[in-house]
Structures are given as C-alpha cells and as structure tokens.
Curated annotation (Swiss-Prot):
One of its GO terms (biological process) is malonyl-CoA biosynthetic process. Belongs to the AccD/PCCB family. This is Acetyl-coenzyme A carboxylase carboxyl transferase subunit beta, chloroplastic. GO terms for molecular function: acetyl-CoA carboxylase activity; ATP binding; carboxyl- or carbamoyltransferase activity; zinc ion binding. The lineage of its organism: Eukaryota, Viridiplantae, Streptophyta, Embryophyta, Tracheophyta. InterPro entries: AcCoA_carboxyl_beta (IPR034733), Acetyl_CoA_COase_Trfase_b_su (IPR000438), ClpP/crotonase-like_dom_sf (IPR029045), COA_CT_N (IPR011762). The keyword Protein biosynthesis does not apply. It comes from Carica papaya (Papaya).
Amino acid sequence: MEKSWFNSMLSKGEVEYRCGLSKSMDSLGPIENTSISEDPVINDPDKNIYNSIWGESSSYYSNVDHLVGAKDIRNFISDDTFLVRDSNRDSYSIYFDIENNNFEIDNDHSFLSELESFFYSYRNSSYMNNRSKSDDPHYDPYMYDTKYSWTNHINSCIDSYLRSQICIDSSILSGSDNYNDSYIYNYICSESGKSSESENSNIRTNTNRSDLTIKESSNDLDITQKYRHLWVQCENCYGLNYKKFLKSKMNICEQCGYYLKMSSSDRIELLVDPGTWNPMDENMVSLDPIEFHSEEEPYKDRIDSYQRKTGLTEAVQTGTGQLNGIPIALGVMDFQFMGGSMGSVVGEKITRLIEYATNEFLPLIIVCASGGARMQEGSLSLMQMAKISSALYDYQSNKKLFYVSILTSPTTGGVTASFGMLGDIIIAEPNAYIAFAGKRVIEQTLNKTVPEGSQAAEYLFHKGLFDSIVPRNPLKGVLSELFQLHGFFPLNQNSIK
C-alpha cells in the first residue's frame, strides 16, 4: 500500500495534472491525469518532474492549487497520508483510511527535508525569478514572498486545501491564539446518489503541545444505531464482526479471539446432530406467581417483551437429540432472555429433563449461562436450586448416570451454587466469567476491591473448581469421547429413526 505524503495539482490551460510526493519514491513524478490521458508527460514515467514540468520554458504552470473537487473526496482520502506543520513547527503525519474507518495522526520528521526541498526548488527556480508576479492571476503571496516564513506557507496550504476538500473549520492549523479547538468534518456517507450523510470526526488541537486527541461526535452514534443489525461489537477489543459470518465462526471475535455470547439455538445447532433435536416443554411459561410489583415495567409485560425479542418462551431450552450418534438429554440456558435468570419455569423444565434422562438412561448435558435466581419470583426461584439438586442426586448417585456441566460466560448466583457445579465432569469455556457473587456486589458489600481476573475461568481452573477448559471448536468431539469412555456409544445405523 503506497501512501502519498502531499498531493498537489498543477494546471496548464485545460489540462490538470495530479502529482504527489511519496516517501518510497526515488524521484518525484506525476501520478495520474485527471482530464486528458494522451499527454506525453503522463505517459513517460521516466522523466524527472523538474524536467517535465518545471524545466520546460514553453510551459506555463501556475502555483500549487487544490487537487480535486469535493465530490471526489471519498476517492481521494480513501487511503492517503500527508505531512502538515503547526504554528510551532511541529510536523505531523495525517493518515486517512475511510474504508477501514481509520484516522491517524503521528509525528514524523523523516520526510520533512524532502518536502521542503521540493517547495524551495520550485520557489527559487529561474522560471519563478524571471516572471512577473503581477501578471499571474493565480499569484499566491504565501507561496512566493520571502516575508512569509515556510511555516506560515505550509500552514496556509494545508488549511486551504483541507477546508476546500473536507470542510475544515477555519481555525485549524492557523496558529491563532484565539482558537484551540478545531473540527474536521468528513462527508463520507452517501446512499445511492441521495444526499450524503456526514460522519463527524472531532479533533482537538492544542497549539502549545504536539499531542492530539481524537473525539467521536454524536453523529457516530446515529450511524452505529442505523447499521447495528449488521454487526456485532466485541466486548473485549470493541472490534466489529459481521453478523452474517459470525455464526459460522462460532461467535468468536475475528480480531482478538474473544468468545462472544451465543444464543441457546446456536449452541443446540453446535452440539446436536442435524435433524435429531426434539424439544421438551416448549409451551411452559411463567404466570407471575407472586404478582411481583414493579414501578417500571410489570413482570408479565417484561416476559412478553423478551419472548418477542428472542423467540423463546423462557430462559432455557430443553430436549433430546444425538451428539455424533449418541442419544443425549440437553438443556441450554439463554442469557439473552432476562439474563438467563432461573425462575420457577426454568427450574421445572430442567428438573423434568433430568427426570426424563433418568428414566431413559441418557447422558445429560446442561449448558449454563445465567445471572442467578430470578428476583421477580422471590423464594420460588430459590427453591429451584434445591429441586434441581435433588433430581440430580437421584440421577447421579442412585442411577449412576453421567452428567456434564458446561459453564459459559457468565455463570453466577444460584446456578453456580447448584447444578452448575454438580457435574461429574465440569467444563468451562475460555475466559468465561464464573462466580457466585458478582464483582460489583462483592465490592459494594465488603467495601474491598476484587482483583482483576480472579473470577475468570483460567484462574479458577488452577484453583481446582472444574476439570477442563475446552474451546468451542473441539467441544463436540470432546463430549463424544467422554460419553464413550463412560459407556455411551452411538446408535447402530439401522436403529436410527
């Protein structure tokens, strides 16, 4: 990727040339012809810019002017870098990359001498010394008069260029003591020839320091909200992941590898063989048993809104299926439904699943993702902990069957204190948040700071809280081997319905 440090246009009658200075170029030459492609200067890359443009006495070129029209700004700054100076003679490398939504500003002095040499050669050329300034309709005093310093000239050039191309505020790079804050407005959003939407970048420039801080404007939020259905933002690196491809990547961030939350339906699809899933108790819903009073939103209305949002009736899906041909009983909690909280319906569905697995001698998997007991159901939600634990005791101790608990992020509260930690084999996902009381609750209750990472899966694994940390990719294979090790084998092909 070649980056142009400074771009200029020189005009000869009706012909316009675009030329650039690049750090990687041995000589300076024209890049493209924006109007006429037959010109020999453009088609001869071996000619030096001083011979092809400055040195020919028959050529008449005006001073450095602006490059392209505002309508071409999207193409021009799609991936360009150029050098600017502030009033303190501090140089900055400004890099635009609109396609990847990058805007970078860095100090860079390595190219300064080359840039100065270029303009000094132009200003001190014999052509400039012999011609009359008054005859030039495009005469720019900032370019030629010795009373203006190089600093003022470069400030003026960049200020004028940026203002004409991307609507820069008049105070930027002007060196004025009355203005410390400057704003660059990039008009980069357009839709099918309609009026373009503006995406604002707010840049604070302190004339007494060389540090620049990029701020986001309020319009960024509007654009994010408009296209949020297309992307999923990583909780760890804040990178954007295209939602269409995220499912095929098992909801793992492409940038940092962080494990994003998965819906219960996606987890069922990940673990269960296609066409073998048989859900249980789908129509079981909560009826607000204690008539919980809420000043904000009634409990029933909240349940209804989550049902519409997720397409589920409750915070857990239960059923039977096959995992690599092995019949299993599976329960998957969904954090998107009221934080995966465990109410009376969640507890009843899990209890019925365990009882069914006990009667059918099926291995059991429960995928945990919950914030704990549901406060809107009071003590009834707490009783689910004892009810599920009692059913598991009969399943594990009396029937000697095999239960695997999978802890995902987050697993907290009553779920951690009951069936989450009762598995014969306890598996955790990488970097999962696993705790009884959350960090905020502990700090507010004990008035002590919880060490960073003390509730992460990797730390708890070394303390012996569970048996293994298994990534999502090999999870199905690991479970299949565990089941076969404990005497659960795939069905014969002839017996598969």
